[in-house]
């Protein structure tokens, strides 16, 4: 499971305390400040939707998975919001397959990878993991998995605040600094599920993390150099044969920061949070792997979010807000679930007619500037942002899924993209 470390210290303002537990919280309501309907889609307390870039939907787009209070996995019907348990016992979920309706996960008792069919409940053990190794990515045709492992020393433990693995720690930034400075030998490895063959893809002393296979190309893996975003060349892609190891976002200024990258649904683009420099100018950047074109959508600081996401057709984006935007001017104005409409036209003219030069060499790609037009959907004023909401669009674009402890316990919620029509 990809680590959800953000790269920014929580300064000036602290996250709100988790509110008191509300027994039988409302099933649905209309946010009085936005006019958008919110639905609590999980019944059991301390259930969570997945990390923002982990596929949680079945290939037909009709169901999604979530984690249960005891660490298992349940599946939710997106038409009725009814759910059923599919995997019991404490497991570590990875993703739902892109080709078959199977959920992939790891059982810690035997450190092995399993897959369970969400329709039939048929379960198969796929591979034993090497000592110290974890799996965090499954490729597009479900024939290969990728993971990381540290080969020397003891990596800094990921501290959490006690309620569940979705919560981040107050000392997260310090942990990241320590881990980056340790320069531990680590590697990305793959396992071919057809043959069981294990192979080392990369081995070095950079902090390798955040693995994501392309959703369409089974031979293409994205990974990152983890650490404070302004200290690392973060986003990379590599082929499963070890070739074409490529830096996606070369830094061009001091304190430039990029991270929380994710694939477009068609596998043609990589999107990510970009700040030039950190805490001053904010973008959601897109890089087209086929054409090498770059598009930077400017975003207001008051709408910056910990995570961004996009619909399958990339016509809409969303963000989960933040308790403290990065930079020296922290405030609480970002505590919203946001909807963003991307625009590359200003004053009636395409922005691409005034493209900026990116890089220094002849023939370098030019950046297509754009802008996000934001709309507030859910006020998250009672949410403790140590639990990151991790927004995800449903495949039909009608809802944004997120997790929250606004009622004390954690549940998964859905907010309707269209404004609700209030009843009498």
Task: Say what each PLM segment does.
Residues 77-81, 117-121, 192-196, 239-243, ...:
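Short loop/turn segments that connect beta-strands within beta-propeller blades
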Residues 273, 278-283, 298-372:
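Loop/turn-rich, solvent-exposed surfaces of beta-rich toroidal or solenoidal domains
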Residues 29-49, 369-380:
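A short helix->beta-strand "capping" segment at the edge of beta-propeller domains
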Residues 89-187, 196, 200-203:
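Asp-box/WD-like beta-propeller blade repeats and closely related beta-sheet repeat scaffolds
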Residues 64-70, 102-118, 127, 146-152, ...:
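Beta-strand C-termini and the immediately following turn/loop, strongest in propeller blades
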Residues 47-65, 89-106, 130-148, 203-224, ...:
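Conserved beta-propeller blade repeats
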Residues 387-424:
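Blade-level signature of beta-propeller repeat domains, shared across WD40, Kelch, NHL, RCC1
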Residues 15-39, 177-189, 360-367:
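Blade/loop signatures of beta-propeller domains
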């Amino acid at each position: 499971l990809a680590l959800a470390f953000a790269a920014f210290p929580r300064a000036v303002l602290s996250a709100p305390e988790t509110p008191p537990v509300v027994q039988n919280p409302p099933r649905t309501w209309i946010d009085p400040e936005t006019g958008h309907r919110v639905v609590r889609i999980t019944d059991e307390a301390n259930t969570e939707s997945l990390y923002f870039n982990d596929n949680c939907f079945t290939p037909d787009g009709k169901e999604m998975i979530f984690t249960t209070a005891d660490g298992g996995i349940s599946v939710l019907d997106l038409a009725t919001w009814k759910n059923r348990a599919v995997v019991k016992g404490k497991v570590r979920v990875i993703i739902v397959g892109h080709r078959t309706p199977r959920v992939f996960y790891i059982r810690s008792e035997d450190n092995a990878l399993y897959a369970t069919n969400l329709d039939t409940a048929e379960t198969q053990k796929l591979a034993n993991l090497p000592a110290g190794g974890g799996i965090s990515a499954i490729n597009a045709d479900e024939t290969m998995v990728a993971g990381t492992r540290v080969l020397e020393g003891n990596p800094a433990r990921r501290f959490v605040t006690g309620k569940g693995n979705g919560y981040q720690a107050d000392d997260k930034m310090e942990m990241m600094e320590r881990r980056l400075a340790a320069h531990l030998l680590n590697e990305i490895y793959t396992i071919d599920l057809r043959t069981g063959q294990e192979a080392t893809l990369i081995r070095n002393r950079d902090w390798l993390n955040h693995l994501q296979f392309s959703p369409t190309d089974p031979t293409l893996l994205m990974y990152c150099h983890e650490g404070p975003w302004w200290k690392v060349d973060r986003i990379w892609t590599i082929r499963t044969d070890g070739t074409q190891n490529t830096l996606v976002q070369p830094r061009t200024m001091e304190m430039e920061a990029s991270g929380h990258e994710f694939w477009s649904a068609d596998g043609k683009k990589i999107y990510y949070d970009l700040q030039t420099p950190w805490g001053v100018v904010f973008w959601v950047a897109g890089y087209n792997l086929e054409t090498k074109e770059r598009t930077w959508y400017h975003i207001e600081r008051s709408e910056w979010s910990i995570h961004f996401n996009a619909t399958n057709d990339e016509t809409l984006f969303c963000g989960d807000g933040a308790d403290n935007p990065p930079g020296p001017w922290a405030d609480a104005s970002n505590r919203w679930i946001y909807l963003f409409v991307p625009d590359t036209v200003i004053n009636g003219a395409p922005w691409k007619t005034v493209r900026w030069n990116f890089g220094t060499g002849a023939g370098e790609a030019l950046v297509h500037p754009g802008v996000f037009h934001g709309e507030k959907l859910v006020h998250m004023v009672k949410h403790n942002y140590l639990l990151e909401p991790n927004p995800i669009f449903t495949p039909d674009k009608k809802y944004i899924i997120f997790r929250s402890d606004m009622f004390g316990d954690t549940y998964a919620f859905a907010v309707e993209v269209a404004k609700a029509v209030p009843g009498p």
